[in-house]
Amino acid sequence: MKKLLIGASALVILIIITLISYNIVQANNPVTEKTSLISIQKEIDKKISTYGYTFDNPNIILNPYEISPLTALIAFETKSPEIITITIKGKDKLTTYSHTFDKTDKHYIPVYGLYPNYNNEIIIKSETKEKVINIKTEPLPEDFILPTNITKKEEYLTNELYFYTPSSKGYTCAYDTNGDVRWYLTKNFIWEISRLKNGHLLLSTDSLVNYPYYTTGLFEIDLLGKIYYEYLIDGGYHHDYYEMENGNLLVLSNNLSDGTVEDYIVEIDRKNGNIVNTIDLTTILPQEEGKSANSTEYDWFHNNSIWYDENTNQILLSGRHQDIVVSLDYTTKKINYIIGDPTNWSSEYQKYFLTPTNNLEWQYASHAAKILPNGDISLFDNGVNRSKEEKNYLKAENNYSRGVIYRVDKENMTITQIYQYGKERGSSYYSPYISDMDYLNDGHYLIHSGGISYKNGQILNVPASLGEADTLKSITTEILNNEVIFEIELPTNNYRSEKMPLYQKDNYHPTEGITLGSFNKTETSKNQVPLIKYKKENDTYNKYNIVIEKETNRLAITGTFSKNDKVKIILDKFLGKKTYDFIISTRPYTAMCVDTFNNNKEEKLTLTKYINNTTLNGKYSIYIYINGTVYKTNYYVNF
């Protein structure tokens, strides 16, 4: 018995020594933790106060959330509830903006539309007095894009602004009718830009779940840059969303585990961030039919827009790589009809294609399909190749893009073209990718040809980044009753443009931002790597420029590699080793709609592997396997 106790004690001591020695071997430096924007803004919110400030001596904070330089916040208290009106003086009537806020005794007045590098004059009025405030702003960044040409008929214009999200170099921003910059963000928030019913904007986050542009989700923000909600989406967000009548969001996403992209839609419950419905287009449409020249096995549909019509319970999707716009019943997920050239589609699907009734031209590689108030359908017809048959392809220099409106007769399965603009402008208006058309009112449209590009004076038939363009252009045209009343030309490519007022239901709320939604568990490798033999960081390791950061809900490992490199990430803790594949490749994209995240301009690839913290717990040492060698980094991560 005594021997057994001694033996057991020795075993316990051995285990303790093993654990201590293991921890000594494993103990390194903690990885750098990247503070999220939500966390940064929580600290800012704590410092914003009305207490002790009055109408005559207000608290004035320029760029309060540090990402929207042409905004400010004026905070003060009044003895009794009052209505406050603010006016931002412009250079003329069309560029002067006013807004009246709800009655209260604690006033948080957001100031939008400041000029850059300017001593702006702001007039605030209470019910009993008036005060002038001057706010001096900093110059624009040196790389800011300014218009090269403005055409306007002022008698038809309103004092709204033209908002943009970039596709290439540039900023998410807004220009007034003079072409002056009146708002911009310093963060890379992209894709669709429009107002929610509550007046907030919904833009992408500035982090990726996957190359080249699938962001972690969406930020609901105001023009100050304050984030109210972050919606995390495991498959990422791209291109477009739609706010439903019940407040839920229909979002274009991916099912990254099935080997294809841009063919998956999720409905997000705004109250909790949960996904309450999904649509997988691989179960609805054939992947091998109706292919355009840009179709790939990976990106076979390339869904670039979504619209929901509550009256008919249909969703409208634009598939660039099948040259179709498809209407689905949202409940049954069955096809209602397909708009597009039926060439190269089987008899099984021919029954869904609408029959033209007049001299209709089909759309090719379209974007931004929408259902108008009267049931008509508008879209931007990019027009790539203008045929499904290679022998009939139209060259870019002979091609054109246009805004189009179609009228669909569902009962007779026919379609009529009732409006177009852009064809008359020829190749100078030709955008082979991105772009937009917005219905402003009957006979009043905003048509945005956002992806015009040239190389050596020749107009390109591919996205600017894929064609190594040396000249970029976007043209946004406002049309009223067939007359161009405004046009702005910018020397860059812009994904979308929206005409919107500066203020819309803008009651600032000093509440902390909330993150909703979650990421799934990151799949581990089928091939494990033993840690019996490893090297410390050395010159060979350092040439890969490895950067390791911990984000709020995941680990990010970035490095610069060659396409043939074999890389794995190993997270190791006692009795808990995890190995993850780091795939060093990029897919052959034929539609690089947004190039703002792309750092891979050279032969080597700078890529990031994300490991979600779901199911991970405790302290892990970080090893990196590269081409047969295991490197023990100097870092650990704690989940």
Question: In which residue ranges do the predicted regions lie?
Answer:
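Histidine-/acidic-rich catalytic cores in large beta-rich domains
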Residues: 33, 38, 54-84, 88, ...
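Sec-dependent signal peptide cleavage junction
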Residues: 18-35
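Transition segment at domain starts
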Residues: 43-50
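Short beta-strand segments within Ig-like beta-sandwich modules, predominantly Fibronectin type-III
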Residues: 98-104
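Extracellular/oxidizing-compartment recognition motifs
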Residues: 93-97
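N-terminal Sec-pathway targeting helices
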Residues: 1-13
